[in-house]
């Protein structure tokens, strides 16, 4: 197969590992810088051009769309879909999961547990909004933040009111969320491919930070997840329609709660913490899907 890896960063560990996994399973891997793709949208033969030539002959793509380029990245993935190329994460699912509000709304419809979350537009909604999620302390999040940036813990009602006012004054879209204190600055990251959790780790934030993101200095350790957590992670990925995803779960007093589903989950942290290759299963999954598409057999993966 010829597999395109959509990434702006060819030197990144994750990009390199995906290339290696494709090659070790006998496929051709091409790293494509998403932002350098330009598209010809027409009803006869939609195409993508790249550095002066047309991209042809691809069987599948693995999108690694960075949060800062969601709009353009999804357009490129969608164009590949229009050309009949299999996308291991399609454009609709990436867009769904990237917007934390949309994602939580979809998860809530499936009855998947999550911290109580509020969303508002007008500043005069603030006191009731704060009460709705159980009062302070509470967490305030930018809708499209990532790597823990734009996730704030407001310890008091006054702090919460001023942070919410400031964000809304800047026209930022924010979520207001119940703070799960008992998770103690840690969460569980499950790496899912298809309908399987391939690897999981517990992430613990640095001393004094409630955020567990590895990019902010958190560290990972191997963890055994429960059957309920496994089921929940898989259901969340299915609700998004993703095939490759990183699911963040908080362990709360009322059981596991989903925080979010990431469509371009980090690969370095989970592989180094667990010693499990998560890239091989991605390529294996793509092989099954592409083969099933060709023969029109029902897809069992
Ligand atoms: N409601 C909450 N209660 C307790 N801790 C929370 C809550 N929300 C977020 N956190 C902590 O903050 C971290 C970052 O939050 P979240 O995953 O929502 O943001 P992110 O910026 O999208 O991160 P990622 O890099 O995983 O995409 C979480 O991993 C968790 O440790
Ligand atoms: Mg995220
Ligand atoms: Mg997260």
From Swiss-Prot:
Keywords: ATP-binding, Ligase, Magnesium, Manganese, Metal-binding, Nucleotide-binding, Protein biosynthesis. It is an enzyme of class 6 (ligase). ATP binds at residues 141, 178-179, 187, 211-213. Pfam families: RimK (PF08443), Rimk_N (PF18030). InterPro entries: ATP-grasp (IPR011761), ATP-grasp_RimK-type (IPR013651), ATP_grasp_subdomain_1 (IPR013815), RimK (IPR023533), Rimk_N (IPR041107), Rp_bS6_RimK/Lys_biosynth_LsyX (IPR004666). Mg(2+) 1 binds at residues 248, 260. One of its GO terms (molecular function) is ATP binding. Binds 2 magnesium or manganese ions per subunit. The keyword RNA-binding does not apply. Mn(2+) 2 binds at residues 260, 262. GO terms for biological process: protein modification process; SOS response; translation. Gene3D superfamilies: 3.40.50.20, ATP-grasp fold, A domain, ATP-grasp fold, B domain. Its cofactor is Mg(2+); Mn(2+). SUPFAM superfamilies: Glutathione synthetase ATP-binding domain-like. Its EC number is 6.3.2.-. GO terms for cellular component: cytoplasm. It comes from the Bacteria. Mg(2+) 2 binds at residues 260, 262. Mn(2+) 1 binds at residues 248, 260. The keyword Transferase does not apply. Residues 104-287 form the ATP-grasp domain. Belongs to the RimK family. HAMAP family: RimK. This is Probable alpha-L-glutamate ligase 1. It comes from Shewanella baltica (strain OS155 / ATCC BAA-1091). The gene is rimK1.
